[in-house]
Amino acid sequence: MSILIRIINYSLSLRPNIVNTIIMKITKALLTLGLASAMMQSTAQTAGGAGMSEPRQNPLLMKSTLPFGAPDFRKIQSSDYIPAIEAAIHLQRSKVADIVNNKQAPTFQNTIVAFDESGALLGRVSNILFALASADKTPEIAEAEKQAMPMLTALENDIVFNKALFQRVKYVYDHQHRSLKGEDKKLLEEVYQKFVHAGALLSGEKASRLQEINLRIADLQQQWGDLLPDATNHAVVWVDSKDELAGLSEADIAQCRQDAESRGSKAPYAIVIINTTQQPILASLDNRDLRRRVYEASIHRSDGTRGFNTFPLVAEIAKLRAEQGELMGQKNYASYSLENTMAKTPENIYAFLRQLIQGYTPKADAETKAIEEFARRTEGSDFKLEPYDRFYYSAKMKKEMLNISDDEVKPYFNVDSVQKNGVFYAAHRVYGLNFVERKDIPTYHPDMKVFEVQDRDGKPIALFYSDMFRRPTKRGGAWMSEFAKQSTYRQQLPIIYNVCNSAKAPAGQPSLLTWDEVTTMFHEFGHALHGILSNCKYNMLSGTDVARDFVEMPSQFNESFASIPEIFDHYAKHAVTGKPMPADLKERMLKSINFQTAYSLGENLAATCLDLAWHVLPSKDVPTADKAADFETKALKEIGLLNHQIPPRYSTSYFNHVWGGGYAAGYYSYLWTEVLAVNIADCFAKRGALKPEVGQAFRDKVLSRGNTGDLMKMFSDFTGMKQPDASALLPARGL
């Protein structure tokens, strides 16, 4: 993966924009470098006289006066982004030229640190732009993103293939690597390896071709980023009468009415399609034909059936990536992409997956058989269970066996209580953190909230933004990212945000969550903690800037706190009465967490294998767009995961993690890091899950360290284990 594409699209659950490789932080030399004109992007009338005007300073190019250096969204306009990007690119080019033209011998300080600092302004500006491009993509923001992408990719190419710059980096690596210690040594290694991995050792035609590929992939991913959200928005299922929504709660029906109103009211009600294959609403819909319509809208959203077709983009991206791998001396893209991960090779990942598939398959078959038998007992012996029936009869089966349903527990999962009395409370108990809402700090959308994060001694350590509710301008999924990464060298505290896609209740009503949405909030805040608790010297090494197959560990581990009784009891309170969840309901609900979990494992295994199947192909074998769907079927069949009842969590045509995000040949990392998370959760349970000293040890040995050391050693230092224990995964899922 090219450096810039990873910067812009590397999502956490998906979850984007977390790795700043060549784009770093703030410098002071704007005006002295002749950039004053770029900062004056619009004009305003002065009070002095008619016809007079004074330049308006671009707020993106000015150091923020807000606490923590937070973005001042009161001042930023959509028209500010491109002039700011252009000025910041110009500044980084000047900084790189200064490094190259330095007459002194290359040193760690005048080359490596200087390079780490060279993109500071561009990092600040692009972090804000790409945050909005994912979470509040108005037409103006979409246009700014479209214009920015080719400029940024061209900059990346110019830096990566700047032979004079790389020679200085290589000189430092060759002459100072042995003498440097700690984070200095790690930064040198990371900078050198990133240049090499991006193609700096290539020359001639190979280097030129790789630059062409980088530019083309950036363009294709921009097209994907426009097309898929549009396709998903158009996949909305319109419903003419309330009777068709039988089975939904009144709150869910009100949400369907509100969704229809926000999308033009083509019918009184609308069912919005989310990013995954299966749609949670199918668990409640009594109308089988409507269930079918919703499911088909999901799986056909972007395969050409309904006018939106991403397969041409998929085929070209896959072929170009395969060529990237070959140019870099590997047999395919996956082998190239995995070089600097914990897994190392596709073969290691396939061995890991086959171990899981072997244990999973009989459990999945038994689970499917049980649901089929239940459905036939309900509907008749000739009833044929379809994928759109799965959630519905599974929910009914759970209701019969455990006497529990989502509608029964949702009133106890008010989004505000889950966040403040659950997510924040767990962080307080485990890490000593406190959260103070800052209503004085502006946001890019009125639904957002901002919190100052304070350590146990009351000292501010981070700023945290929360953007919980779905809207037409927000892409699907949930993620963590940052406006600024932590760095002691820059004296910068982290500015972190979480984005989710929960339904916002009509005015005057509480916004309620499903259990899955509750765990999503804990998951994303696990990523946030990785950034909030970072205590690293250099920006490039801090927070979540770690290997993909490690980055999901803190988030998946943090999910474990959602069901710990002391935490659960603190947030699971009725949204109207404030009373805690009754003991019998709580017992039934917690027992239901692992009910029929073979499905969730199977859909993730299928998606993971799809991702790998596309990226282990040599360029000559990548299928054309018209053969892409057939390739998906063949790939799943060969690995033993072609299951009509358990489709991939993301099918090829809407697999945003892979084609629009930073998880190409990397979706396996969710399962890989789930093993790490299970092992760590076991350690917490044995030592005392809510004991501050246990949390402090995890904070000191893992969360605070970013990418400053060997990741496996961090894991081992905390757990005492030499290697992760994959056998713990299936039991942890109740399988």
PLM regions: where:
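Active-site-proximal, well-structured secondary-structure segments within enzyme catalytic domains
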Residues: 187, 219, 226, 231-271, ...
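Bacterial Sec-dependent N-terminal signal peptides
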Residues: 1-50
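Intrinsically disordered or highly flexible coil/loop and linker segments, enriched in small
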Residues: 39, 90, 94, 98-105, ...
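Short, hydrophobic/amphipathic alpha-helical patches that form generic packing surfaces
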Residues: 121-131, 193, 296, 390-398, ...
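C-terminal, non-catalytic "cap/extension" segments appended to globular domains
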Residues: 52-75, 80, 87, 268-270, ...
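Short His/Asp/Glu-rich catalytic/ion-coordination signatures at enzyme active sites or charged loops
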Residues: 65-80, 129-148, 171-212, 272-312, ...
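Short pre-active-site segment immediately N-terminal to the catalytic Zn-binding motif
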Residues: 505-521
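N-terminal helix-rich structural modules
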Residues: 46, 51-256, 684
